[in-house]
Amino acid sequence: MSTFTLVDPKGWEYDLHSVYSAYIGYFQVHNIPWYERSWGHWFSSFEEFLAFSWPVITVTDSWTGRAHIVTRLTSIGAFIKMLKTRFGETVPQAPNILRVTPFETSTRHLRQVTDYAQYKKLHATLPAAALSALKARIRAGEPHAIKQLWDQKEKTFLAMDFEWSERNDRSCLEWGYAAVRCGHLDSQGQWPPVPEKNYRKGHYIVGEYVDKVMNKHFLSHPWEYAFGDSQIVSKSKLPELITSIISSLASPDSETVGNSLVILVHGHGDLTKMEDMGINIPHNVFVLDAAAYERTLYAVGVRGAMIDPKTNMPRQPGSTLSPDNLLRTFAMPPLQVAEGMYVLSPAKQAQLVALINSCPARNAGNDAFMLLFSTQMLLDSARTEIPAIMPKMRGRTVSMMPAMPMGGLPAMMTGMSLGPPMATRPPMRKSMTSEMLAPQDMIRDDRQYLSTGRSRSPGRRASGVHG
């Protein structure tokens, strides 16, 4: 019975096949007729080379992300010692052996490879190992891996946000999403994505709780979605709706191939609650924690030194920024500019501040859009366009009445939409002591609505092609 042994991956850094390849190259460069030597049969094929019985583990390289079957330098030394002991000749260590820096830090399963069949079987596990490591690197916010994912121009990035009740953290009050299909856009010659035109987005309010359950400690703003019309959805149908959005963007599940979908989150709390809601995510989907990614960028000095928008003090290492405060750091003069860091022009800074002020936080739709937009700014701030926001015209009140046959409606109502109920802002309430507001009284010099009750609700200037 074979024994199961775990070893520390530190020191296991020499690709086994590269050891054999390096020796064949060394013999050729130095004109060594190895095939005429008494020990030459050890190098006649890779299978003969494996007969030495090599101790190996599988790891992934921390820089390239590729998976390798690696051995230790001491094992190479033992092979050279065996040749000298048996055949009386000293074979030097070959140069140019591929060295790997293991990404894994936990113990690995030690295996003994003695023939090509064992090596081939172990080699077949490398794609799954590489995928598992890549998912871990992206989830941890490793900048190199995340930048590679973005530069592939073939993934779909989906940002989601939930607003939960403060009284019952299992009650979802709102859900919003924003997505960009990079592969689709790149095939149309559109790169980088233009947030205002290329983001697919939506905002849903749970009908059972609308205007009934309201958070007090962290006030939410369900009626102030800035990028379109909100929709009312029942509590029982929300998981089905979310599942349909994910299914429309994801590729098939696989143990060896990464999914085309990358889910953006800000922390991992919502993912756990999605499981409780019965929402299944394919195992090969990548999860990118934007907060961890930004913290890593700041820790390594890529973002320079800055003021924390929350405290107005120099930012401390390890601190986490909310999506809107993350965007504010792009609109503030940095305390120190890092090498290669892009700083927005004053005009773009003013445009970004206007966008942030027009999109109230703790609205699930706004937060999802800002999460995706802030992540794109971290990845490509120099070429990312800032969305232009203008006040949204007031619409009809929410209607939850069931759809009726068109023939049974009066002629004056045949133009009504039969789609899902749209939740635009309720009519503005007039104060008991105030006079009727004229339209010009509702617009300030900065083109924003006065904050009267829930009536302030900015919207997007123009719609475009979704990615």
Model-identified regions with their sequence ranges:
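Metal-dependent phosphoesterase core characteristic of DEDDh/y 3'-5' exonuclease domains
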Residues: S2-D115, S187, P195-R200, I205-M214, ...
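Generic structural signal of hydrophobic/aromatic residues within well-ordered alpha-helices
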Residues: Y23, F46, F79, L83, ...
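Entry/capping segment at the start of metal-dependent catalytic domains
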Residues: V91-G189
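Glycine- and small hydrophobic-enriched segments that form the cores of compact globular domains
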Residues: W150-M160, W164-V257, I263
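Extreme C-terminal disordered tails of eukaryotic proteins encode short linear targeting/docking signals used
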Residues: M413-G467
